[in-house]
Amino acid sequence: MSSHKPVRPNEALHKEALEELDAKINEAKKRFNEHKEKLGAIRGGGSLQEKNAELRAELDNIRNAQAAIRSSKQTLINKVKAQDELLKKKVKELTAMKKTVPFKSEVELDKHVKQLQAAVDSGTLKIVDEKKYLREISQCNRTRKSFVELNALQTSIDTIRNELNELRDQLNDSESKKLSDKFVEIRSELDEVRKQQDGYYKDQRKLIAERDDEKTALDDLYNQRRALQREYDTQLRAFRTYEREQRAKRQEQFRLERENREKEKRRIAAQRKLEEASIPAFTEEILACENLLKVFHVPVESSTTNAVSTGNTSSKILKPRTLTPRTVDPIPEGTIIKKESSDDAMFSGLKKSKPKKSNKSNNNQADSDRLNLSFGTIKEFDFVGVPAPFTKSQVDSAVEQLKSRIAHFKEQQDSVTKQRIEKAKQEIEKLEAKYNSKEEKTLTEADMVISSEETVTVTNDLEVEATA
């Protein structure tokens, strides 16, 4: 990698230069295609030859249409005569039918029927006149059917007349005139195409030389465009490579810093775990037993305390156990405490009576033998696995058990401490192995990502070059 930082190429300027070259290429390509077209017309190809064939095909179609018109005229004349005779016959039938109908239209018939019906409904007519009007109304209704036949006949006449007009229009020579005009127009275009082809034949050598010159100029422009695109791609590839390498360096630096931090954390955690495991086993139990012996004023040689205090950091990890004093909730202010004489009898299960002197002496003896221990002291006895004494007579047994527990703890202390240290070392080794495998997997994934980025970059560059 070069020492200086590559500069990213200006994409806007590059596109502007490409557009300028593309415009020149399009102009050169247009001139080249024109010369190629002229040579193709001379050699029997190109647009002029195709146009010549199209014009000839149109002339053939016009000739066929004119021949068909000439052959079909006689048939049209026969059809016109037949339709004209049919029209005259229908008109005569319509005229004869109208003479049989006394009314000009159906509207006039309806008006007359309404007048007759109004006269009948008025009730002022004589019976003879009324019968006459009714017969006339019936006759009018029968006449109404004749109007239906008249309308149908009139529709048929209109249809025949329209068909006759169409046939007469076809007999006119306007279509033939249009075809003739079209024939002359196409013939003129065909003559013009032939003149152009004749001119191309005369200048064939000149056209070939001009075409070769245009081809050379076009190839030169294409080479300029490829060189410009290649230079841009090279600069862009160098810039991307530099950026990728810088990003990889930053990622590697971050990874090393993170790895160092993780190593330091693991070292401190492993050191703490080993220090905790190196604390002599049963230290808290032995301290608890010694504190309990001190409660009963038994002299104790605290070798465990001295061993703990000689360590570098063990004394910071292990805190001395203290006996929690018994606490009593305070009585709210203003509370009146009242003792009833029946309470003793209730809880003792005896009848309410005046206690005898002998019972009083026994109670005093029991109170003097009772041993009051705090709740914290009782919890310490439970912690070391020794029953707590609740009378003075049980103190000696509890002291012996405490001494026995201290001896047992000290006897097992070295072996249990070694086991704890060995177990802590194994746990540290497992954690280190797990971290190393995880770190290797992370590095492999990072290498795969960088490799894929390089592949994508190379592929994009190749696509750009292929497009250019």
Swiss-Prot record:
Alphabetic keyword roster: Coiled coil, Cytoplasm, Phosphoprotein
Modified residues (Phosphoserine): 342
Ranges in coiled-coil conformation: 10-94, 147-279, 399-445
InterPro entries: Bfr1 (IPR039604)
Protein's cellular compartments: Cytoplasm
GO cellular component terms attached to this protein's record: cytosol; endoplasmic reticulum; nuclear outer membrane-endoplasmic reticulum membrane network; ribonucleoprotein complex
Phosphoprotein keyword on record: yes
GO biological process, one term: mRNA metabolic process
Region (Disordered): 324-369
Molecular-function GO term, any one: mRNA binding
Protein name according to UniProt: Uncharacterized protein C458.02c
Naturally occurring in which organism (per UniProt): Schizosaccharomyces pombe (strain 972 / ATCC 24843)
